[in-house]
Amino acid sequence: MARKKISLIGGGQIGGVLAQLCALRELGDVVMFDIVEGLPQGKMLDIAEVGPVDGFDVCLKGTNSYADIAGSDVVIVTAGLPRKPGMSRDDLIEVNSKIMTQVAEGIKQYAPNSFVIVISNPLDAMVTLCQKITGFPYNRVIGQAGVLDSSRFAAFIAWELGVSVKDVVAVTLGGHGDDMVPLVRYTSVCGIPVMELLERKYKDKAKAKEVMEAMVKRTRGAGGEVVALLKTGSAFYSPASAAIAMTESILKDQKRVLPTCCFLQGEFGVNGYYVGVPAVLGENGVEQIIQFNLDAEEQAMMDKSVAAVKSLVDSLK
């Protein structure tokens, strides 16, 4: 049986971590494309040379030619400029939309049967543009945002409560920006509602609410927090790991329910836009969008987030 093939578009920080994770997990052979001559070749050679130490056996190739992504099962797009301190994700739209246009044309020509996972920011606009240019079915073009946002939310909760991150289940909806919607009501620790645990810890409902609001705020600004600390770029370990979870679910048909930037056609009252929602990811890409009820406050936050997505995406038209 032929190995799976994963192509990474963009040889920056995220691309490098993606390549290493793909190799360590032996998800398939990996190609890294970048326009900078020598960069993808050097990174892939560096990773390949540690195969005997880490015990992975896959083919790793760096390239400056889109032709080398032919036959890809999954293409992960990280190409684009990262944020700098003081910038929002939306500030990147003009330059990164030009880059995404070229990338999508390359994918369309050389990997027409692939699944595409977009990481580039501003995410909601970039995945929309990628799908529009490739013309691929909506189930085959998705964006990575919610897995990372939910992971950050879960981490903050675990640290606050002093419990294992493995036992926290959290979910975020909406766009990948300051208006994302961390769903407190659906967040739990080993099945126990998180607010109940916070209220028991502080023995004060008002204090518990205050602590949760701070964690929600931190989740919304988590990417910017990393940017401010790094000063020279944006997060790369965490978005790479999040994209790998999605890739693995597709390649291995795991049917995992993961927060995914999907094209909505009426779900959650949204029609014709890519928005973050829980979805089943399997061998057919997005196989099912998981719908559930939102209360009035949650719906209002979702509406605000979707409005921000629409404004950003419509600016591309």
UniProtKB/Swiss-Prot annotation:
It comes from the Bacteria. GO terms for biological process: lactate metabolic process; tricarboxylic acid cycle. This is Malate dehydrogenase. It catalyses: (S)-malate + NAD(+) = oxaloacetate + NADH + H(+). Keywords: NAD, Oxidoreductase, Tricarboxylic acid cycle. Catalyzes the reversible oxidation of malate to oxaloacetate. The gene is mdh. GO terms for molecular function: L-lactate dehydrogenase activity; L-malate dehydrogenase (NAD+) activity. Its EC number is 1.1.1.37.
